[in-house]
Amino acid sequence: SRIRLGKGRRIAQRLDADIIAGTYEGIDQVIRTKKSLGRVGTVVIDEVHMLEDAERGHRLAGMIARLRNAAPEAQFIFLSATVGNPGALAKQLNAALVEYEVRPVPIERHLIFSSGKEKRTLLRQLVAQAEKLTSSTGYRGQTIIFTNSRKNCYNLAQAIPGAAAYHAGLQYPERKRIEELFGQGKISTVVTTAALAAGVDFPASQVVFESLAMGINWLNVHEFNQMLGRAGRPGYHDLGLVYILAEPGRRFSSGRGESEDEVALALLG
């Protein structure tokens, strides 16, 4: 079978492949410009929980409607690992609900209450601890650290040996270089924002939340589950480890009213 993948933001001119893979925006642009997708038999939409995303949700909903209009006989398969209410979403999409509860690699979740200064010491300890572990398939432990700003990405990366800062503001060649080095095991730790949660595949054994905020707003359940789902990859790791470093009493004026420790307990509940 022929598979075509677009590179960057450029939309492939030939759409005669057996399988066409694209972003929501890329496929939607093809439909809007009246280009023919041919006879479509199956449409698979990954990360369908993005319907609830403030920025991309309306675009995804519109694309689904236009695809259904363009390919009325096609089978639609919607995938997500982090839908909060799958029954309601299935009803909204007029789809049959199929739930699969088994995770190939089990996850251990740990909550540690700590202050800002203590967090850095804990981060260094957790990273060093992960590096000492080797899975049954021979892969050394690696860590993804989530923080709430690009500035913190650099500050934390400088404070942790072997760490690299990764965020959406980096140029593509630099992002690609970090992805390849991490994939090869040459970088032990990536410090990132929520940018990594959306679509980048890093095989990490451990995920650490230095902050439970995205910018100045607390993470919601979907965002949190998407991020912690990075811990443990089939074929690489035997166990995924997740650590939440929550600062009691920490609040953001523009976020929800809860403190970080309260948010942590709610997300884990």
Question: What is the meaning of each model-derived region?
Answer:
Residues 1-30:
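Inter-Walker segment of RecA-like/P-loop motor cores
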Residues 5-12, 164-193:
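Conserved helicase ATPase core of P-loop NTP-dependent helicases/translocases
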Residues 16-19, 39-42, 72-77, 141-142, ...:
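Loop/turn-to-beta-strand initiation segments
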Residues 24-28, 33-76:
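SF2 helicase catalytic motif II
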Residues 29, 50-51, 85, 152, ...:
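Residues immediately C-terminal
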Residues 41, 189-213, 240-245:
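A short beta-strand element within the Helicase C-terminal
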Residues 65, 73-157, 246-247:
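Conserved interdomain linker/interface between the two RecA-like ATPase lobes of SF2 helicase motors
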Residues 74, 202, 213-265:
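Conserved segment of the helicase C-terminal RecA-like domain
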